[in-house]
């Protein structure tokens, strides 16, 4: 590891630092300690999540644990929910310029996803002091298998 950046913060920097291809990277989940599948590693990279370092070793997060962690954070740290115009008033920043993640899967929300929430008159949620919403995948009623497990919509 280089002296200026001893612990790469994302998957791409980790691969660059150690001269690995993404397909060759092997990580364990920081919570369940199981190996991440190739799909989990790609999802972790696409979601722009940070690598967690413990005792000098990098960890990622599997999809199941990310959803569980999101639910736990939602239950423990939900402050309030409101519509987009209120979020803009409170932050002083237009919704398109606010960095937001999906509170379920943690993917950064695209402008299209934020716009769908605004047009659909859906609420944004302040969880752990950060504004969140749901992405098109997690908010889609087509993919909901257990409506009782969905909250904050």
Curated annotation (Swiss-Prot):
This is Protein E6. SUPFAM superfamilies: E6 C-terminal domain-like. Signal peptide: none annotated. Its main location: host cell. Keywords: Activator, DNA-binding, Early protein, Host cytoplasm, Host nucleus, Host-virus interaction, Inhibition of host innate immune response by virus, Metal-binding, Modulation of host cell apoptosis by virus, Transcription, Transcription regulation, Viral immunoevasion, Zinc, Zinc-finger. GO terms for cellular component: host cell cytoplasm; host cell nucleus. It is found in: Host cytoplasm; Host nucleus. Belongs to the low risk human alphapapillomavirus family. The cancer-causing human papillomavirus E6 protein has a unique carboxy terminal PDZ domain containing substrate but low risk E6s do not possess this domain. GO terms for molecular function: DNA binding; zinc ion binding. GO terms for biological process: DNA-templated transcription; regulation of DNA-templated transcription; symbiont-mediated perturbation of host apoptosis; symbiont-mediated perturbation of host ubiquitin-like protein modification; symbiont-mediated suppression of host innate immune response; symbiont-mediated suppression of host type I interferon-mediated signaling pathway. Plays a major role in the induction and maintenance of cellular transformation. E6 associates with host UBE3A/E6-AP ubiquitin-protein ligase and modulates its activity. Sequesters tumor suppressor TP53 in the host cytoplasm and modulates its activity by interacting with host EP300 that results in the reduction of TP53 acetylation and activation. In turn, apoptosis induced by DNA damage is inhibited. E6 also protects host keratinocytes from apoptosis by mediating the degradation of host BAK1. May also inhibit host immune response. The keyword Transcription regulation applies. A zinc finger (unnamed) spans 29-65, 102-138. Belongs to the papillomaviridae E6 protein family. HAMAP family: HPV_E6. The lineage of its organism: Viruses, Monodnaviria, Shotokuvirae, Cossaviricota, Papovaviricetes. Forms homodimers. Interacts with ubiquitin-protein ligase UBE3A/E6-AP; this interaction stimulates UBE3A ubiquitin activity. Interacts with host TP53 and EP300; this interaction inhibits TP53 activity.
């Amino acid at each position: 590891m280089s002296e200026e950046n001893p612990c790469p913060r994302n998957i791409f920097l980790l691969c660059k630092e150690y001269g690995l291809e993404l397909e060759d990277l092997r990580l364990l989940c920081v919570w369940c300690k199981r190996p991440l599948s190739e799909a989990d590693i790609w999802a972790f990279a696409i979601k722009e999540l940070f690598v967690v370092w413990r005792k000098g070793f990098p960890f990622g997060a599997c999809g199941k644990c990310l959803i569980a962690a999101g639910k736990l954070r939602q239950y423990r740290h939900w402050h309030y929910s409101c519509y987009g115009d209120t979020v803009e008033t409170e932050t002083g920043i237009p919704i398109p310029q606010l960095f937001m993640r999906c509170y379920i899967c943690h993917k950064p929300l695209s402008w299209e996803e934020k716009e769908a929430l605004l047009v659909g008159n859906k609420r944004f949620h302040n969880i752990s002091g950060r504004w969140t919403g749901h992405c098109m995948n997690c908010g889609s009623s087509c993919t909901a298998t257990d409506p009782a497990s969905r909250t904050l919509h």
